[in-house]
Swiss-Prot record:
Protein known as: UPF0754 membrane protein SE_1527
Pfam families: DUF445 (PF04286)
Keyword Nucleotidyltransferase (UniProt): no
Compartment annotation: Cell membrane
Domain of life assignment: Bacteria
Family per similarity comment: Belongs to the UPF0754 family.
Keywords (A to Z) from UniProt: Cell membrane, Membrane, Transmembrane, Transmembrane helix
Record's bilayer topology term: Multi-pass membrane protein
TM helices/strands, residue ranges: 4-24, 356-376
Length: 376
């Protein structure tokens, strides 16, 4: 009887020691949050592992996101997908459709170009009109766009940048929230785990890949809603818009393209007998085909221009955004208690299994110690 009690006591004692040891080890991952000192000597294991390596963890997560999750190549692929093209073209269509509700007349447009429409009745319409347009183009093709267009029009264009920012953020959220986005994040995370270092391996002891991928997906979606991210995107778009305004006319519209557009306008004008009346009526009534042309042809060209321009300058955009630093700074702003609760919430089941395993292993070791004690 004494022998059995000894073995049982050793099992219980070993289980308690093993379980409590694992509980303390888990707590020491997070606690204490700051170092403690006795006189001038720092107490070992203070602060805890995660508080001590917090900046390194944030840096690694930022590196993962920038180099393997939100990459330039991935963004280029998404921009060139048919769905993205359709969304951009719909946005342009929406802006062009506003012309249908404006009272812009041909006379106003011709006046902006320095053309007296009434003179066209007395002169050879074709020669006069085309020569005038060609002269205007030759006179202005080396001038900046900001020097040619009215300030009110430039301000209106600039006012659309916030809508583009919202559109880009919304598209990013839609992708990250989709099954495809979730699968891409998991696959890239899995590849990274197979290639990269120790800190990620340490995290994987307490969190499954699915949990990490889910958390990254959640944080990326939240990042697209963060005001600072939207400010950065808006600033980049504003900078690119300023660059675009500073381009010469011939960089935007080639001479042959300008001639084609001029001929199109001329053909429309020739279809009307009462030219003066027609030129003073709104474009939406006079030349509805022109609006249709803008919707069908120009919108496609503008869509291609936006996608090609964005893809061309994507490297500079990503450098200006500095996604790695943005993520790192965001994680470093998290309260340590919040990080602890976050990890425990995600890996709660696994942590409980570790503590249970400590009790079991401690009990097994206690059993063998009891058996050895009997024979000693």
């Amino acid at each position: 009887m004494h022998t059995i009690l000894l073995v049982v006591f050793m099992i219980i004692l070993g289980a308690i020691i093993g379980g409590v040891t694992n509980m303390i080890a888990i707590k020491m991952l997070f606690h204490p949050f700051k170092p403690y000192y006795i006189f001038r000597f720092r107490i070992p294991f203070t602060p805890g592992l995660i508080p001590k390596r917090r900046e390194e963890i944030a840096r690694k997560i930022g590196q993962v996101i920038e180099e393997h999750l939100i990459t330039e190549e991935l963004i280029r692929q998404k921009l060139n997908q048919p769905q993205s093209r359709n969304m951009i073209q719909q946005l342009i269509h929406k802006q062009i459709s506003k012309l249908k509700n404006d009272d812009v007349t041909i006379k106003k447009i011709a006046g902006f170009l320095g053309i007296d429409v009434n003179e066209l009745v007395d002169y050879k319409l074709t020669t006069k009109f085309l020569n005038k347009l060609n002269f205007w183009y030759e006179s202005n093709k080396y001038r900046k766009l900001s020097e040619i267009l009215p300030q009110s029009f430039l301000d209106q264009c600039k006012g659309q940048i916030e809508y583009i920012t919202d559109f880009l953020c919304e598209r990013a959220r839609n992708y990250l929230s989709s099954e495809k986005g979730e699968r891409d994040i998991y696959e890239m995370l899995d590849t990274f785990f197979n290639e990269k270092g120790r800190i990620i391996g340490l995290l994987q002891m307490f969190m499954t890949k699915e949990s990490i991928a889910d958390r990254i997906q959640h944080e990326l979606i939240r990042l697209t809603q963060h005001p600072q991210s939207q400010k950065i995107i808006t600033k980049v778009l504003n900078d690119e818009y300023e660059i675009f305004k500073d381009k010469n006319l011939d960089e935007i519209i080639k001479e042959q393209q300008f001639k084609n557009y001029s001929q199109l306008v001329l053909n429309e004008l020739k279809t009307y007998l009462n030219l003066k009346d027609k030129t003073e009526r709104p474009i939406k009534q006079v030349v509805p085909q022109f609006i249709q042309f803008l919707e069908d042809d120009t919108s496609k060209r503008m869509t291609d221009f936006i996608i090609k321009g964005t893809s061309k300058h994507l490297t500079n955009i990503m450098k200006k955004i500095n996604l790695r630093q943005l993520v790192e700074e965001q994680i470093n702003t998290f309260d340590l208690k919040y990080i602890e609760n976050l990890i425990i919430d995600i890996a709660n089941k696994e942590l409980k299994l570790i503590m249970t395993l400590g009790f079991i292993l401690g009990g097994i070791i206690g059993f063998f110690q009891g058996v050895i004690a009997i024979f000693v």
